[in-house]
Every structure is written in C-alpha cells, then in structure tokens.
C-alpha cells in the first residue's frame, strides 16, 4: 500500500498511519510487521537470502522518540539478509523491497527486541517504527574473490553441507548470454563434476549448500568453463555463466577420522590417479581437489608402521609437488611456494621441489631467492639445462628490474629538483616584487613630505 492511499491528513503520526493502513507482510498474518511504501523502487527484483544489502534508516519508539539513525553516522548500514544479523522484522521487511524504495515498517515486540529490549534506548516489549531506504543489494560472494556469487531463492533444511567426495543429487539449469544450455537432474561426486560436464564452481558452491536449498550462482570464467569454453554446450572461452541449482539430496563422504590408515593409503592411490587425469586435461582446480585429499588424509597421520610410513611419505611428497605444479598453472604463486616448502621438508634435495619453488619465486619477482633455488638444483643435478637457463633469466630480470627502478627514481628526483627550483624562483620573485612595492611607497612618502609644507601658509 502506498502512502497516498487513504491517508487521513498531514497531522497524523507515521506510526498511527502504518498501524491503520499498513500491509501485513508476515507469513502468519498476525500483523506483527506492517508496511507502507513511501517511495516506489526500481524494477521488480528484490533481495534474496544471503544478499548483502545497503540501507539508510531511522528508528523510533511508538511515542515518536528517535533511538537510532544511520543518517546521523553519515554511512549506510550493511547486513546479510536472512542470516539473523538483524531483527526478524527487518529480515521480513527488507526482503519485500526494491532498489531505491523507501518504506515505513511498524514492528511488534516479537518481531523486534521482545521482552529483553535493547537497553538503554529500547525498553522491554517495545513496538518500533522504522523508515528504511534500500540503497542497493548484491549476492553473497562465496569465496571473496568475485568468482562465485550466490543468491538464495529458497533456504535449505538443517545445518549439514556436502563435503568433498560427497554423493549429491541436484537439479540444475545453466544459462549463458540469456540462452539456456543445460537443464537436467544429475547425481555425481563433489569434486568430480567435470566428469559430468559440470563446472568447478558448482562443486565449490555445493559445499556451502543445505538439503533442498535452491540458489542462483553467477560464475566467473575461473569457476566456469575457463579458457577452453565448452563446445558441447556452445560456450565460448572465458564466458560468464548463470546456474540455478537445487540440492535435492546428498550423502557425505567419510571424514579423515572415520578412515583407518589402510583405507587412507588405498584411497590416496585412487585420488592421485584422478588428479593426474584432471591435470593432463588442463583441469587444474579439479586436480587440486584430488591431491588435496591426500594431504588431508595423511599429513597428520601418526603411529604408522615402517611400511605405512614409507608409503605415506611417498604419497605426500607426490601430492605437494603436484599441488605446486597446479598452483603454478593457476598463477597462485604463494601457494605454490608453500607446497614446495612442504615437499622439501620431506626431501630437502628434491629436484622438482627446488625447481618449482624457483619458478614460483621468479614469477613473484623474488629474483635472488629464485636464483638460489636453481643453483641448488644444479648441485643436485649438474646436467639440468633448464635450471641453468633459469639462472640466466633471473640475472637478466634482476638487471632489468634494477634499471627500471633507477629510471623511476631518477625521474622522481628530477621532478623534485625542478619543483624545488620553481619554488625558489617564486620566492625570489615574490621578494623582489615586495622590495619594489616598498621602494615605491617610500618614494611617494618622501614626495608627500616634501610637498606638504608648500600646501600650508
């Protein structure tokens, strides 16, 4: 209901107006949250569960006394919708708003602060009035890198999520550029969606979903079909994708603590092979998932027999080295260095570990550290021609970097010198002008003093 519909007069308080004319927006229809639209918003889209929303608001008690206002702080209030970060009335009310809309909400205590209140400003069992302006809203950034944005259409059940290796059954609809390219029910193992033409972003998002949850996922190229695209679906390289996904059911995979050493070693051999298949196919993020399982299972495994310990160390060394190579391909050089460090912790003279750490550090412009690693490679294997070439590359890059720095600093100092000279010149000019004015004043004063006697009897 808009403010003009049935408004009595300008003198009636906003609280009374909402109480009499407001729309009941509660699911129970118990008049616990009443709403009047003061300014209609733009479009038809409203915020969804988990969206980050930006609002300005004023809050008053039923007697008209203001207890809070974002305007007084000169900054919007930001929260995630439907996550219990605000009072119930806000989660209900803001979910009905459109961008740019201003509304009035009247909230009964059970939808606000209840019998506890929020002392000292809000007493027990207080009915509250709010004026809210919805400035903006956007989906939940699942990994804080902009690669997967989730908008939840329907909240899931319970608190359990699928884990890596879980068996899931989902319904999905994929769109690109407004065209639907995929629509089906499918069952698969989380982390292995690629085997079913499902992008890695779906695997990642499923680990944050609950049973029966329905959401829209916006996938950047990194989490979609990447540089290769997907000719089967007519998807071009580096395309952005939109998927609507419903998690119908899932069965979690065994956690590490539920497996004995024998089972872990058996599974390590299986996932190592899967990881290698993904790596050879250019599916580096999928390969990371498989190699990462080996680390999660075996890195903290204790009390092994000599035979088990040897097998475990072999799997871990291979996993860290392969993870380092994956991270190099993914341009995550810091992670590549960390994995090499762990591999070298198991085998300090490992040629691949030293070489790959050198590669990562060279790409991070850590020329001296990289050169040191390549020199160690030659100590292990003097015949490694690639390492010798990389040492030359380190020296060349370091020289170029130093020369570039010298040019930058030289230009910087030149500008500073020119600026100082200009300021000195301006000071000198100002001083000269000042002296000229003083001399002129002095001359005029003398002339006046000389003329003064002549003007009097």
Swiss-Prot record:
GO terms for molecular function: FK506 binding; heat shock protein binding; peptidyl-prolyl cis-trans isomerase activity; protein-macromolecule adaptor activity. Widely expressed, enriched in testis compared to other tissues. InterPro entries: FKBP4/5/8-like, PPIase_dom_sf, PPIase_FKBP_dom, TPR-like_helical_dom_sf, TPR_rpt. Residues 1-24, 420-457 are annotated as: Disordered. Residues 1-11 have a biased composition (Basic and acidic residues). Residues 42-130, 157-243 form the PPIase FKBP-type domain. PANTHER family: PEPTIDYLPROLYL ISOMERASE (PTHR46512:SF9). This is Peptidyl-prolyl cis-trans isomerase FKBP5. It comes from Homo sapiens (Human). The gene is FKBP5.
């Amino acid at each position: 209901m808009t403010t003009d519909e049935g408004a009595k007069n300008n003198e009636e308080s906003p609280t009374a107006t909402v109480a009499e004319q407001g729309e009941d927006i509660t699911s129970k229809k118990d008049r616990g949250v009443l709403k009047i639209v003061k300014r209609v918003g733009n479009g038809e889209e409203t915020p969804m569960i988990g969206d980050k929303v930006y609002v300005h608001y004023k809050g008053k008690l039923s007697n008209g006394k203001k207890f809070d206002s974002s305007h007084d702080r000169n900054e919007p209030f930001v929260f995630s919708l439907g996550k219990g970060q605000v009072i119930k009335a806000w989660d209900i009310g803001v979910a009905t708003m459109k961008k740019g809309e201003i509304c009035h909400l009247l909230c009964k205590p059970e939808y606000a602060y209840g019998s506890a209140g929020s002392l000292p400003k809000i007493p027990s069992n207080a009915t509250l009035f709010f004026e809210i302006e919805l400035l903006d809203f956007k989906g939940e950034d699942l990994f804080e890198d902009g690669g997967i944005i989730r908008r939840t259409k329907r909240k899931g059940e319970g608190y359990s999520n699928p884990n890596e290796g879980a068996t899931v059954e989902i319904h999905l609809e994929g769109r690109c550029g407004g065209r639907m390219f995929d629509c089906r029910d499918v069952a698969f193992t989380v982390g292995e969606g690629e085997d079913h033409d499902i992008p890695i972003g779906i695997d990642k998002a499923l680990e944050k979903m609950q049973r029966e949850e329905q959401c829209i996922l916006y996938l950047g190229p990194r989490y979609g079909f990447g540089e290769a695209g997907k000719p089967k679906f007519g998807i071009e390289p580096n395309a952005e994708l939109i998927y609507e996904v419903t998690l119908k059911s899932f069965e979690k995979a065994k956690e590490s603590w539920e497996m004995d050493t024998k089972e872990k070693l058996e599974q390590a051999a299986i996932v190592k092979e899967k990881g290698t298949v993904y790596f050879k196919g250019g599916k580096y993020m999928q390969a990371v998932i498989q190699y990462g399982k080996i680390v999660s299972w075996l890195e903290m495994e204790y009390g092994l027999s000599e035979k088990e310990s040897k097998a475990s160390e072999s799997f871990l060394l291979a996993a860290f080295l392969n993870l380092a190579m994956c991270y190099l391909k993914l341009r995550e050089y810091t992670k590549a260095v960390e994995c090499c460090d762990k591999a070298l912790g198991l085998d300090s003279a490992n040629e691949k570990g030293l070489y790959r750490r050198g590669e990562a550090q060279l790409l991070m412009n850590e020329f001296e550290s990289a050169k040191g690693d390549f020199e160690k490679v030659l100590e292990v294997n003097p015949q490694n021609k690639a390492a010798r070439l990389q040492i030359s590359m380190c020296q060349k890059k370091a020289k170029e970097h130093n020369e570039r720095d010298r040019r930058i600093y030289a230009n910087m100092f030149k500008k500073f010198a020119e600026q100082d000279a200009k300021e000195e010149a301006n000071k000198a000019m100002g001083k000269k002008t000042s002296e000229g004015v003083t001399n002129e004043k002095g001359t005029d004063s003398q002339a006046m003093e000389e003329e003064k006697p002549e003007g009097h009897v």
